[in-house]
Amino acid sequence: MNQYTKRFLTSTALFLSLAATCSTAATAQDAINVYGPGGPAPAIQEAAKAFGAANQMTVNVAAGPTNQWIDKAKQDADIVFSGAENMMTDFAKALPGAFDLADAQPMYLRPVAILVRPGNPKKIRGFRDLLVPSVKVLTVAGAGQTGLWEDVAGRTGDIAIVRAFRKNMVFPEAANSGAAKQHWTEQKDIDAWLIWNIWQVANPELAQVVPMDEPFRIYRDTGVVLTYKGSAQPKAKAFVDFLQSPAGQKIFGKWGWDTR
């Protein structure tokens, strides 16, 4: 092999290496990384797919219990979404220096609901039916439902209602909605599940929904925030705008969120 051929091959290899590096960098710039809990995930994922297709880019969504994605989010999160205001505060603590909590934007609300077994064998029609001694109720103690059952049961200021409801709760409480779903699937003797309505929309085969009656109905929101990294990316900003656009509202409405 002569010197000219060697130089040519070396130059070609260097060019291909640089091209691959540039291609990888371009691909990274064309992707945004989104992290958050499982509750809002079906709507976020559908929105990500629609936005990505329209803009010829990738929107990566990692959702579920925080411990499954928090380490990766520390490295490359552009956007973080939550299932309640207390969750966004927790994410700010878990991702120190990643974003300004004051920049978080509430997007949509959803109501608490009562999920029952298919066919509603206990004939549950409202919250007071959950106070009957023979009813077993599944609740969640953490994530976006921290304090949820107490807020619902305490709405009237009647401590007797709080006491009666607590006696019917299944202990220990589920740590998050995903764990609650597993309990609901495995423990067939549980009669009702106090959770956000969106979980029935996403899992219609597992339960029927009984809308929460007043005065016990409460709402919590899903919020979104750009990280400092994401704030430097126009496409990340555009995706946040898309989530709250008419097209985004339609998607969230499909998954049970109140988009008024």
Which residues are covered by each model-predicted region?
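Bacterial N-terminal signal peptides that target proteins for export
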Residues: 2-12
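Exported/periplasmic ABC-transporter solute-binding proteins
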Residues: 27-62, 67-77, 84-85, 91-93, ...
